[in-house]
Amino acid sequence: MPARRSAARIDFAGSPRPTLGVEWEFALVDSQTRDLSNEATAVIAEIGENPRVHKELLRNTVEIVSGICECTAEAMQDLRDTLGPARQIVRDRGMELFCAGTHPFARWSAQKLTDAPRYAELIKRTQWWGRQMLIWGVHVHVGIRSAHKVMPIMTSLLNYYPHLLALSASSPWWGGEDTGYASNRAMMFQQLPTAGLPFHFQRWAEFEGFVYDQKKTGIIDHMDEIRWDIRPSPHLGTLEVRICDGVSNLRELGALVALTHCLIVDLDRRLDAGETLPTMPPWHVQENKWRAARYGLDAVIILDADSNERLVTDDLADVLTRLEPVAKSLNCADELAAVSDIYRDGASYQRQLRVAQQHDGDLRAVVDALVAELVI
């Protein structure tokens, strides 16, 4: 057993402060057809060497990332600084930047894979499901001071999974069809064998043992092949939240980043105060994910281990009030307050459905509306 523990050891870098980082995935769409364009390689080459711009699985996708930031406003400005020049290059090539959880009508069979061994290996292993991953999301990293805090925070954060998914849900379409889901992306992504909800661990050693087993049995070769909706990033010293669908605009992105930041820091501080963080049974967490994906802001979610239920927007109102002091301390009070605008004015999936109805089902109009929302 000691030898196994030594082999399983994973060092967590740790962050002295609850710093913030954001990864924002964009699709490239043709300005005329509004369909996806497999031109990311050329776009990234023209942008040149830039640590803020990354390639992704498919050649229709460009990822914009922030640096290490102290607050939401800093992260949003960092993203803006990269987005402006990048969008100009994209437009000069007859395309637009588009972000939602899925594209309204694009076909997966027309998409090209980025030339990289890890992507080729992913498709070789996952086959049909892997080729279906025509999805885009937002990932938020929050710094955690030490490894022993990561698992309790991650497991407790799952209580807020439906809140984040319902607010960000932006993928009602799949291949031109209305799926009836607010977030079809959430249902698609979990089909990959190492994706979906994380296991409920309380100790870092449990996670180390899990990774050891995954590697020994050939399920993964590297840590980044664990594609959970929330996962540790040991080399960065962060907890990475990957729940949210793609977000079309900076205002909503700022609201969701601020909410994520506040939730994690609140749990972190409660741990410091000696509190045992609340958790729910895995079956409740799984049900909440499905309800939020299916019903979005109309979801009635399970609140606790006692199976109490409540409309997600009603619970969000109380969560936002409770987090106000945390937001002030993190300099994101305005961004957190903007969360309520999302459920008051309508989430992306609701806006998309409304646009489609107003244009007699023409999904090109949905693409145009989402592109127009990206005000830099």
Curated annotation (Swiss-Prot):
SUPFAM superfamilies: Glutamine synthetase/guanido kinase (SSF55931). InterPro entries: GCL_type2/YbdK_subfam, GCS2, Gln_synth/guanido_kin_cat_dom, YbdK. GO terms for biological process: modified amino acid biosynthetic process. Its EC number is 6.3.2.2. Keywords: ATP-binding, Ligase, Nucleotide-binding. ATP-dependent carboxylate-amine ligase which exhibits weak glutamate--cysteine ligase activity. Belongs to the glutamate--cysteine ligase type 2 family. YbdK subfamily. This is Putative glutamate--cysteine ligase 2. It comes from Mycobacterium tuberculosis (strain ATCC 25618 / H37Rv).
